[in-house]
A protein has these predicted regions:
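Solvent-exposed, non-transmembrane regions of integral membrane proteins
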Residues: 1-683
């Protein structure tokens, strides 16, 4: 009986993962109709919950209050989800200015009636100062009861809902003439409240398991191999181009540099001209320096001498087939070379590749974007002065952004950390094989290097936050930066007692920053979309990213432990056995905060989703894979029910395999499946 819940747990996790791939192939409507909304899917969850409840009772879990509250919270959340599924209703309400409405269309296209009347007084789009980037969408509404008595005049906007008599209204869309507004209607009188109660119980239970003196986490902290050192502090964390260059008319360096601090409109925000120039040259040429010229020199010279600069090979085309089709030698094309008289050479090529999703098609799109930027520059539409009345950046803000642009924090760090990481792991393995300890001078030097790397990265990350005016967690590039920072901080807290954590910290942060540098992530600083301007989102992303960083440490622990146990003589080597035991204990210890942070992060994301668009769960691929990760890591705590997890090798291999789910959650969804949470997939 005790193994039935875990059999159902793994079966459910496998079905959830498979459903995301079916959704990617057949569409969201298909997978909802044939999976998420089916009787057998609900029955599977009910069986899982019922079997878990039976085990809780048979084991008298209430004798362990923290664990009981946590598991009870999970069951309460499930009960809330069932109530939402069977008693909740959602739909859309269309309001036109001055026209009263008392009904809406539900998800099944049926007309449902409201016990009151709503009238749209006005709708407006609010923008970031001096830009065309929306900061909010606002509906001013009047609410009257059936007798015509005014109940309220609410302001409904993104992340600001209106509730009346069990109905909640969320800003969803608007009419093009700005005289109509679409509101999402959610009537869930029981499910949401019950689910939120479960959320609270899960948080209380998680905290209780961390603080319970007789709990597994505190017992691990008291283990002789882990007692020394500052481990408890973990709880407080929670070149000039070489191509031949023809003489070019170029603006003098001093003149161009004087333009760097000029404030312009860029990416729908106020920014120094240096930011625009740097991003333009990086985008078009692939590097921030062209033939030894500063970005400001390139942009200013191209604007002043367009005829000459249009014939300069500066537009990088990485795809060999496209270069051959265009008849271009080398990797760089001229803007003039993309035209044959008045004919744009990319147009017929794009018509041939449109809809094929081929590498050539993507290369054509990328080159077209670069050509478009160059044309905007020559036509004088790329550099936009500030509109009258636009608030200007302070001198301190301008200096901060110029400093951020001039110091390549990301590039310096990934190169330095990867180099130090490989050297550190080599020295660590050499000392272990030779059975030599680390001398004090070496330890101090490596510790200093780790702290310097951490402080340098923290300075760059905080500088980016100051420049953007928000917590830098808006896109894939910024979340990768945050993960690297958490990895480095964790390594700093653990390395004194566990020297093998040091190379892990360098390597993990280095590879994370390398992915951010090389991947398809956008490092430009942009304003937040209205729905993203929520503190719930910031906490949701922060906690989940911290959990991912800790899971990465557990994975590397597993790889190192498996490597040590693969040696034939490990059974007879006391030092190796002690190292393996240390790695096992450390992984089990980190499993507590990492899994709890992931779970609480998922819950906060549900609250954010409910506040923003009226649904605390929507079976988006990112949500599904985060839930799968929580289920997979949650199973690892149950060594009594799953005795094979007591064997060190099996435990470490399971942790390595579990991290593949985390990689799928972050990278797989972003680049393969898409969805509302995807940073990279245009779908």
């Amino acid at each position: 009986m005790k193994s039935i819940p875990f059999t159902l747990l793994f079966v459910t996790a496998a079905i959830l993962g498979a459903a995301t791939f079916v959704e990617n192939a057949r569409g969201t409507a298909f997978v909802r109709e044939y999976a998420y909304a089916t009787w057998w899917f609900k029955a599977l969850w009910m069986l899982l919950a019922a079997s878990a409840a039976v085990v809780l009772v048979r084991r008298r879990m209430w004798r362990r209050p923290a664990a009981f509250v946590l598991h009870a919270g999970l069951l309460v959340v499930f009960a809330g989800a069932l109530l939402t599924a069977f008693t909740g209703h959602k739909g859309l309400l269309h309001l036109r200015q001055g026209e009263p409405a008392s009904s809406y269309v539900d998800e099944k296209k049926r007309v449902a009636h409201l016990p009151f009347v709503l009238t749209l007084d006005s709708f407006r789009v609010e923008y970031y100062a001096g830009t065309s980037a929306p900061s909010d969408y606002v509906s001013q509404v009047a609410c009257h009861d059936a007798d015509g008595t005014l109940i309220a005049r609410p302001r409904i906007s993104m992340n600001r809902i209106f509730s009346a008599e069990g109905y909640r209204f969320y800003q969803s869309s608007f009419d093009e003439d700005l005289k109509g507004s679409w509101l999402t209607v959610n009537h869930d009188p029981y499910g949401t409240a019950v689910a939120y109660t479960g959320f609270l119980l899960i948080c209380i239970g998680s905290l209780g398991l961390l603080l319970d003196p007789r709990g597994g986490f505190r017992r691990l902290l008291r283990h002789p191999l882990l007692r020394k050192g500052g481990l408890f502090a973990l709880l407080c964390l929670l070149a000039v181009d070489g191509q031949a260059a023809e003489p070019l008319p170029v603006v003098r360096r001093a003149q161009a540099d004087s333009l760097a601090a000029r404030q312009v409109m860029y990416n729908d925000r106020v920014a120094p001209l240096n930011t625009l120039c740097r991003d333009f040259v990086q985008k078009v040429y692939g590097r921030s320096v062209f033939r030894g010229l500063s970005p400001e020199q390139v942009v200013a010279s191209w604007m002043l001498y367009p005829e000459e600069w249009n014939r300069v090979p500066i537009i990088r085309i990485k795809n060999r087939e496209l270069r051959e089709r265009l008849g271009i030698r080398g990797e760089y094309a001229t803007l003039a070379g993309l035209f044959d008289g008045t004919t744009y050479k990319l147009q017929p090529l794009w018509q041939q590749e449109m809809g094929k999703h081929s590498q050539l098609g993507r290369a054509i799109q990328e080159t077209d974007e670069k050509a478009g930027l160059a044309l905007m520059l020559t036509q004088g539409t790329l550099v936009r002065p500030l509109p009258p009345g636009t608030p200007r950046l302070s001198e301190q803000q301008v200096r901060a952004e110029l400093l951020y642009n001039r110091i390549p924090f990301n590039k310096i760090l990934f190169m330095a950390n990867l180099t130090l990481g490989f050297v550190a792991i080599g020295l660590f393995l050499y000392r272990m094989l030779k059975r030599r300890g680390e001398n004090r001078t070496s330890r101090r030097l490596w510790t200093a290097a780790l702290w310097l790397s951490t402080l340098f990265h923290a300075a760059g990350y905080m500088l980016r936050g100051y420049v953007s005016g928000r917590l830098p967690l808006n896109n894939g590039y910024e979340t990768m930066q945050f993960v690297a920072l958490v990895v480095l901080l964790t390594a700093c807290l653990l390395e004194r007692r566990f020297p093998f954590v040091r190379p892990f910290g360098f390597l993990l942060s280095g590879f994370t920053l390398l992915v951010a540098h090389l991947g398809e992530m956008n490092p430009q600083i942009t304003p937040l979309m209205p729905v993203l301007a929520s503190p719930w989102l910031s906490w949701h992303v922060s906690l989940i990213m911290i959990s991912y960083a800790l899971f990465a440490f557990i994975c590397l622990n597993g790889l190192l432990a498996a490597g040590l146990m693969a040696r034939p003589q490990h059974r007879h080597d006391a030092l190796v056995r002690e190292r393996v035991e240390q790695l096992t204990l450390l992984s089990r210890l980190l499993l507590y905060p990492s899994t709890f942070l992931l779970g609480i992060g998922i819950l906060l994301g549900s609250v954010w989703a409910n506040v923003s668009w009226g649904s605390y769960w929507s079976w988006d691929p990112k949500e599904v894979w985060a839930l799968v990760a929580f289920m997979v890591y949650g199973a690892a705590f149950h060594r009594r029910t799953l005795p094979w997890l007591r064997r060190p090798l099996a435990f470490h291999l399971y942790m390595v395999a579990a991290f593949l789910v985390v990689l799928m959650t972050y990278f797989g969804v972003n680049y393969l499946l898409g969805g509302m949470h995807s940073y990279a997939n245009p779908s």
